[in-house]
Structures are given as C-alpha cells and as structure tokens.
Amino acid sequence: LLKEKLLHRWPRSEKGRLKTDDRTFYRFSAVNEKIAAFRNSKFIIESRTLKGFCVGKDGRSRAPLNLFGQITGRTNVSTAINPFGAPRRMRTIIGTDKDHYLVYADWKSQEAVVQAYLSQDKNMIAAINSGDPYLYTAKKVGAVHKDAVRKNVEKERELYKQSFLAIGYGQTPYGLKNKLGISLPNATFIHSQIVRTYNVFQEWSKNIIAKANQRGYFITKYGWKYWLSDREIANPRRLTNWPIQSHGSEILRRAMIDLDERNFEISMIIHDAVLIHCKRKDWRQMRKDIAEIKQVMSDAAEKVIGAPIGVDTEIIKESYVQKKDDKKRWEQLYEKLIKAKSGRIASTREVD
C-alpha cells in the first residue's frame, strides 16, 4: 500500500487497523490494477476456508441471521455459511426451480433518505425528491450545470455521492482527501460546500449526539438502545453513524414482519434489501405481487422515519446474474475447483 501510495487513503477499522474486507478491496480495485489482481487471488485462496453452505434435501441453504448482531441492530451473518455474508461472487450459486422465481428488492438511496427525514433538512429532502440526491447535490453547489444529465457527468456525480455519504458519517476534510485521493484544498472545498448546503442535518447530528451523551444512550423509534459508557471513548464517527444505520435496520425488520404477514416467503434479508421467493403465476399476477412487495417495503420505511423510500427490484428467474467483473472471477474460481476435483478423482483411481 505504501509503494502504491494508497496507505493514507486506505480506510481503517474503529481500532485503527487497515480494513481487509472485500468491499474495501473492491473499491480500490477500480483505481489500481495490482489491488484488483490481489483481490482476485485473495478470493480464490480464501474460498478454501468456506465451510460450505448447509443445503437440505429441498435444495435450500439455511444459515442463522444473527439479528441485532451489531450495535446498530443490523444482522451479523456468517461469512462462511451464508452466501450473502461471503464475497459477492458467491451469490452466483443462488437460484430457484422452474415453478418459482426470486425477487431481490432494495431501497433506493436508503441511507440518504434516512438522514434527510430524521433531521428534517429541507434541502436534503429536496435532494431526495429530485430522484437522484447525489446529482442534485453536484448541481446545487455548482459542480455541474443545472441541466446536466447523469450519463454526461458520471465522474462528478460519483465524487459528490462519496462525499455526501462520507460527510454524513462525520468524515473530515482530511479523511475526505484520503478517501477520494484528491488534494486537501479540494477536499476542504467540497466538504464546506456540502456542510453549508445541508447545515440543518449537521446541526441535528451534533444535537442528537449531545443528547445521547447527556442521558447515556442512543435510542431508535422502536426502542433499540446503544448505551454509552464513561469507561470507553467512543469513536466520533460511530456516534454520527449510529442513528442512520440503526434506523435502517429498523426499516428492514419492519419490512420483514410486514412481508411475512402478507404471506410472502422471505429467503434472506440483506443490508438494505430483501430476497423473496415467489411462486410463478401468470404475468399479470406476478406484476401484482412485485408491486405489493415494493409497496410494503416503502410503507415500512414510512412507519419508521415518517417518509416512504422507493424500492428497486431485480427478478431472478433461474440463477443470480452477477456483474461482469464478479461473473468473471466466479468462472475463474469454478474452473480451478473443477480441475482440483478432477485431480482428486484421478488420484483416487490410481490408488485403487
């Protein structure tokens, strides 16, 4: 990392250690070929540590969710026996039979919407209502023309998306500089733009942390608490992050309950999404079911934060279709596994 000039940009855990999760490697693999190659090798090597998915006679894999496994109330699923805990490429094995299909439904810009409506920042709510809060932010601060369309300003949109989310979790100009790989003056300028634009959110965040410190705990709408201790110095970013993530987890749990009460079969809950197993019907009825899923999930958000959140859906008719990069990595791993299996079979025959 030092040789590649990435050490200062590389994110760290709350204990100060360099992060080694797949999400971090994925982010840096887009800007550094060596990191991309290392990520690929790491995935293949670590695949040997997978304990295997617990598949029953019915073809279902079952793994514990470990609800409330994190301080924010989010799940903490196993990276060894849960396909959604393992690297994304492992999702290729997810599929269904000819009589069913899967619906992968996820909330659009969930964290940004939660920030906006918990804080009641009118500028941030306007950004959400625009349909693309990150492009709106870039336009609002004058980084792109007010009539710009996403496909023509993708680079600028991504810059302000990363900045919007990072600053929402307490990122400083120095942290933003390292995260984005830009100069400190540029990072300071972008930081000041976003803080000024969404100053109501910034004040709300400070006030809710002050209130939590005063009474000794944070609390969500439905009563999940995070107790603060005078024996431990909490990471400031954790305190800023907690209200957003904890209410995101409450939205997910509310949706899980409501979908179950509507007799939808939930296969898995993910960070900001739900995987639902549906019986194949005529196209009109399937569309009706999907529309109901989206409505239930949107309503779940409104019950928690007072505003609905839009939902995107992906239909999986046979097996999970990966993005180009992850699909390629999976094919490489699968090829190596087949060769290894063939080698073991040949060795067994020689012994016999």
PLM regions and their residue ranges:
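Short Gly/Ser/Thr- and Asp/Glu-enriched loop/turn motifs at secondary-structure junctions
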Residues: L1, E158, H191, M268-A273, ...
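Extended, well-ordered alpha-helical scaffold/bundle regions in very large, multi-domain proteins
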Residues: L1-E33, Y169-N207
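Acidic, glycine-rich two-metal-ion catalytic cores of nucleic acid-processing enzymes
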Residues: L1-K151, A210-A273, I290-D299, L333, ...
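Catalytic palm subdomain of template-directed nucleic-acid polymerases
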Residues: Q115-Y117, T172-P185, V274-K294
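Short, amphipathic alpha-helical "recognition" segments used to contact nucleic acids or chromatin
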Residues: E158-Y169
